[in-house]
A protein has these predicted regions:
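H-loop/switch region of ABC-family ATPase nucleotide-binding domains
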Residues: 96-97
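ABC ATPase C-loop
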Residues: 53-54
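Short loop immediately C-terminal to the Walker-B catalytic DE motif
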Residues: 67-68
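Q-loop/switch helix immediately C-terminal to the Walker
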Residues: 1-11
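Conserved ABC ATPase signature
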Residues: 36-40
Length: 121
């Protein structure tokens, strides 16, 4: 996992403090840094992907079922992270079947049915 983050940090000029902050914000700690991503749990993989977005300073996050594989507290932490990202002018596109949670996070909503937009609000 550390190599993955270091690669992206190099690409954008992020330093060790920014990597550590991204890991903390994503709910990860240094104990997992030597673990290969393929050996991580589903929730840890999602958190690693979020840490990469944070290190990359991505202006757009495309999250497909981001709450899958997370326990209830992990889902709440992810929601907090999404809210912080949006407050920092990050655009978040969230694809989810959890409509209640998505609506609580959304500034705008688009429903897709059969591959076409069926509702926009």
């Amino acid at each position: 996992m550390a190599e993955n983050l270091a690669f992206w940090a190099d690409m954008v000029g992020a330093n060790e403090a920014e990597i550590a902050a991204a890991l903390t914000s994503a709910g990860l700690d240094g104990r997992l840094s030597s673990v290969r991503v393929s050996a991580l749990s589903a929730g840890q993989r999602r958190r690693t992907a979020l840490a990469v977005l944070l290190v990359r300073r991505a202006e757009l996050w495309l999250l497909d079922e981001p709450h899958a594989g997370l326990d209830p507290s992990g889902r709440d932490e992810l929601d907090d992270l999404i809210r912080l990202a949006v407050a920092s002018d990050v655009t978040v596109i969230l694809a989810s079947h959890d409509l209640e949670r998505s609506r609580a996070l959304a500034g705008r909503e688009i429903a897709v049915k059969g591959g076409t937009v069926s509702e926009a609000a």
